[in-house]
């Protein structure tokens, strides 16, 4: 008896998103079958694991499988599994996927990809957002889902035509597991809508996309036996056939697995639509035996910077699925790596808490990490185009490892690439920077900022450009943090151009005598400015890093920069920023004029106002925020009025 029937509407954003998918954002509509089979496989994995861990769960796991059923007359295709199943609440949550955070972003990106006729990008985005189930609507006018959770008596039926509404109801007498029935659209070769009731078509799709699935995929097929006697009729029978080989790819030698098989396996475990950038197959024997098949994606997922997102490494023990996102197997900064690890000497009853203390898991993690890093190193040296693709997509998170993985810090530094003043187009490694260092240069100079353009306009950079020193341009938020942890590379200290003392006078353009003379000439002004601007600065001194600007602000060698303080505050840590150092260009007309004005009329309020303007312009030039914008604007407006 049916009960609790509800007809609900997709939320506005979800309805628009579904509409985008229904109207051909998939270039390859065949992929819907891969998605449904992958979901069924996941459900079987979960049931086997739950049955092992929960001895009170009374279920039969002796014949777990996926069944494909075709009804040519009704033009329906059903994918059925006897896996874990779902409760009504879980079905509602599945539907809610479309309405969760990120929907607006996905919809916008899909629309842009569609407008640009970039179908591959559209597929990739849908895969990233984990809603491949809805690809069913590319080939079906209506989709029905019937499911019963293992151990529950009540089942749930969900139905939708993809036009803004769906129904959900509770039903009885349904088998355990989940079935998805597609009411297929008419064939349309121009729109790549094939006959998905064709036995040959279904068998070829399973072989192409899902041959490696660990569970048998069965379908009733037609068998024709030729007549044994002349004039007799052929015999037609129907029998159930297993369509897939069920061979675990990670257990097969790499030279026996085709590139296409690896691609399809990656798409299965990563729920991706693009091809992997690199495949890593490993086998370890000895103390800890395990096999691993890892993939470096070619595109970053939308949730790359969401630390709660799944890591993508599946853990098996002797080919038995244990968990789908084993974060203990890969450091957080490599969370984009997808794949499978199959350990041989571990309990099937392992939990996340046990894994955190497991010596074998820690050893496997170390080896996997080193293998991934060495693979990236090979990309860097042997396939520079692929390395550039990798670094563009994942470089920002790899640099997080400089803060946490001290064992591999040197390797990570070698892998990193940075923009620099050497080239507008090409990034540079630290090793390449060191090779280009000027004679007598002992430090690696860098600058941090929000954008390349902002840094290039910074007063701090002036003397470095004038004297031909290359400067690394670091624009990722994580750069502000790791440069405080990493002190050197290849024996060369890393030096911020905006922190501490920088000596660029080694080329002899400015004699020591001239420098000492300037110190005497500006001594009174420096002391007066330190007192006048005492609320803002701790020290005022002459600069050897300025050539065009009148002034700039410097942080102590070991001080916290304002940008770093902002990052800490954004993460909930209120870090106070100490007073900074104001450096003056002794050759700039504004500075020499201020010195003369101070000598002539030190008590004139306008001289103090000029000091405020000088400090404010230095703050603005580096992209900082004024403490009192109204006061600054008032003084500036008064000065401008006097010039007219």
Curated annotation (Swiss-Prot):
**Per the UniProt entry, what species is this protein from, by scientific name?**
Mycobacterium avium (strain 104)
The gene it comes from is htpG
Which cellular component appears as one GO term in the record? Answer: cytoplasm
Q: What is its main location?
A: cytoplasm
Binding partners and assembly? Homodimer.
Gene3D superfamilies named in the record: 3.30.230.80, 3.40.50.11260, Heat shock protein 90, C-terminal domain, Histidine kinase-like ATPase, C-terminal domain
Keyword line: ATP-binding, Chaperone, Cytoplasm, Nucleotide-binding, Stress response
What's the stated role of this polypeptide?
Answer: Molecular chaperone. Has ATPase activity.
The subcellular localization recorded is: Cytoplasm
SMART domains from the UniProt entry: HATPase_c
Per its UniProt record, what HAMAP family does this chain match? Answer: HSP90 (MF_00505)
This chain's protein is named Chaperone protein HtpG
Highest taxon, organism lineage: Bacteria
One matching Pfam family, short form?
Answer: HATPase_c_3
Citing just one GO molecular function, the answer is: ATP-dependent protein folding chaperone
Highest lineage ranks of the organism? Answer: Bacteria, Bacillati, Actinomycetota, Actinomycetes, Mycobacteriales
Q: Does the keyword Nuclease apply?
A: no
Q: Where is this region: B?
A: 353-566
Q: Where is this region: C?
A: 567-644
Instruction: Quote the SUPFAM superfamilies the UniProt record gives.
Output: ATPase domain of HSP90 chaperone/DNA topoisomerase II/histidine kinase, HSP90 C-terminal domain, Ribosomal protein S5 domain 2-like
Q: Which family does it belong to?
A: Belongs to the heat shock protein 90 family.
Q: Which segments carry the region annotation A? A: 1-352
**CDD domains (alphabetical):** HATPase_Hsp90-like
